[in-house]
Amino acid sequence: MPLKPANYKNRIQEIKTNPEKAFFYSRDVMKTRWPEAEPYIMKHPAYACLYATDVLKKKWPQAEPYIKDSAYWQSKYENKFGK
């Protein structure tokens, strides 16, 4: 049975506000950036870094303060884009 439109909207809202789900949905389903989910994605160092490298494919200055919260993800980000 297909999702009803109301359920679809609720599900998208749930995905959008979850950094992990939003990253994978953007990368694997939408296959493009998802500006509405970016405020949620950027607050998680791992998914912010992965979103920059896999979806945006460029530096993401707005997310850098959050990425820097994790030495590991900061290192990955800087290896890809420089300091």
Where are these predicted regions, by residue range?
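Alpha-helical scaffold segments
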Residues: 1-83
